Amino acid sequence: MARHTRIAGITVGQSPRTDMTCDLVQRLADNLELVEYGALDGMTLEQVESELKPEPSEEVLVSRMSDGRQATFSGDKVVPLVQAKIDQAEADGCRAIIVLCTGSFPELRHTVPLIFPQPLLHSNARALAGGRRVAVMVPDPSQIEQAREWWSMSGVEVDIVSASPYQGIDGVTRAAATLKGADDAFLCLDCMGFTLAMRDAARRASGLDVLLPRTLVASVVSELLG
């Protein structure tokens, strides 16, 4: 079937995100074409670290620069850049927009469906857990307390570990191994940067079933527009 419906994928880092889209495209319906946008496109890592440095009270996000380096920055300060990419994607004729980040976002201006992974991940995890505790992996230790707060607001008790998807699969495997034998319903990899290969490695190391947001989001979008 020919691809004819354009959808936007907006990373809070830089595009293209070939490390992410390879898994996403596999799960998208055949008629969907993914067009990439990056909130940090055109910026250097030094600019990001200087201009978007998180204040103590601000949400911390972790993403990837186009050269593969990890970038850590303020979720609050990146919001206007994400909004600009939403506006651009709509002007380019995209039929729907996925924000490729599991962080929390305020209400943003849009005229086409705007999909945020966090509510999809949290609601599915809550339904699947059936009241049991859920293991969660975030990229950076600085995100643990904010993640605990977000999951608590969604009614889910969590057991949190950290490992960056941008620093290789070994760290993910080691962090997942610390969950071996834990009384958790399953493991959520709480970042769009985690790959299918990392999901499989985490499953082997932890002995837990694993929920991966990038494939969950792709499945939902395909159901909606495929």
Question: At which residue positions do the language-model features occur?
Answer:
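Short, flexible loop segments at boundaries between secondary-structure elements
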Residues: 130-131, 167-168, 210-226
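N-terminal glycine-rich anion-binding loop in soluble enzyme alpha/beta folds
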Residues: 2-73, 138-168
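Short hydrophobic/aromatic-enriched beta-strand-loop microsegments
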Residues: 31-35, 114-119, 156-163, 206-215
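N-terminal glycine-rich phosphate/adenylate-binding segment common to multiple enzyme folds
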Residues: 72-118, 185-199
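Short gly/pro/ser/thr-enriched loop/turn and capping motifs at secondary-structure boundaries
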Residues: 42, 121-124, 143-144, 217-221
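Structural motif
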Residues: 46, 80, 165-177
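Anion-binding alpha/beta catalytic cores of soluble intermediary-metabolism enzymes, centered on
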Residues: 107-132, 136-141
